Amino acid sequence: MSKAKCIMVQGTMSGAGKSLLCAALCRIFAQDGWRVAPFKSQNMALNSFVTRDGLEMGRAQVVQAQAAGVEPDVRMNPILLKPSSDIGSQVIVNGEVRGQMPAAEYFRRKKQLIPDILAAYNSLAEDFDIIVIEGAGSPAEINLKADDIVNMGLAKLVDAPVLLVGDIDRGGVFAQLFGTVELLEPDERARIKGLIINKFRGDVGILRPGLAMLEEKTHLPVFGVVPYLKADIEDEDSLSDRLQVKNAVKPLDAAIVRLPHISNFTDFMPLEQHPLLGVRYVQTTRELGAPDCVILPGTKNTVDDLLWLRQCGLEAAISKLAQRGTPVLGVCGGYQMLGQTLADPEGTESGRPQTLRGLGLLPTQTTFAAEKRRTQSQATVTAEPFAGAHLTGYEIHTGRTTVQGAPLCTLADGTPEGCVQGQVFGTYLHGLFDSGELTEQFAAYLCRRKGIDPAAAAPISMQEYRTQQLDLLADGVRHNLDLAAVYAAMGLAQPAERGNDQ
């Protein structure tokens, strides 16, 4: 079987739009009839996903795989770093935890991971026609270039042609692109086949003189000017923007606590799309106010975030709301916090042995251990008022929770999962709201409590919504990028039947 062709997208900075451009290219190539896979050698992210075989990978490559119409595969993201403190991360290699590592130690040792990276890439290259590779940050970070395994270092290892993208929305895009090219070594510059200006607003004609000068100075063609697209697709940078939302502008007010180490807050994107649910992220008791429900999300450090919750007064405020009957939902680490006790006998979570009291809103006890549970799950909710709702989710956690009360749902194998007591609910299942059934029942429950007619809403399924948004993204890029040049950079001819509708 012939080895796949590849194209790599690098950026002038973090947030230039690499992830979404890669998703767009995955979608476009798949639409053009190719078997496509995304690849990012090393990803740093708060949000992760569990594959069908129980391995953990970054969500950016999951979205790109969905764009390509293929099953997410841990080979697409062999190295995942999940920040657990300001100076260190959990290091995940090929979907398995290697351990906690300070940043300085990881930088010293990361080149030892090159065999894992190449094994994953070469395996993908045997199974697909095109690999769309995403870089990280900027390839011109002088202090990081010597041990680079994710930008030009990776491009050299897999002989990848490179597209360099700059973000005009932040200003200074010509300096970004020219400066990045100038800081590269001659052999690295030779890998760049074209430049892309991303997130443009307005009349592209205004840019023509600047584009001509940029091409003259860099000796590189501009492959396209991509407009600021409104596609609602998760990527690590836009997800961080979502955390800034402070005001609910819909009839129902859902307050999600923005924990210092919040993770997998992609769980709540389906709620954001519901026409009646206003989702906002809060960090203070003043911001919390009196919402229609409170959600405690997942976290990369349950113990530290529980202590933060206690110190800033949110624990007392949430407990008071729960006593008044306000619904409270905890997911993963948030679920653990809602219980009676959290024991860390080996210092797995907090670095030293200790036992903490939880919020005491659920009859559960959690004990942390080194082994992480990673699995996809199907479940049926057994607790009112959501009884009968079917959902599919995944678990990523180290704690084991003992439940004395009623479970929230039952897994496909008959195992009880989660806990419910009154209007307080807890579960380990990430992705629970991707099920349209549970989202609708959750919204209807809040509507009934507030005297709102839930029939006023007619939401679409998240799967349908994501498909629409991916198609919107692909169309926007297809119409503004010289795809013939992109194909030529890979040594391929653009399929005639689709063409490029510029």
Which residues make up each language-model segment?
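Flexible phosphate-sensing "switch/lid" loops adjacent to ATP/NTP-binding sites
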Residues: 1-322, 327, 344-347, 370-371, ...
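Catalytic nucleophile serine of serine hydrolases
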Residues: 332
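Conserved catalytic-site region of short-chain dehydrogenase/reductase
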Residues: 337
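Conserved P-loop NTPase catalytic core
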Residues: 348-375
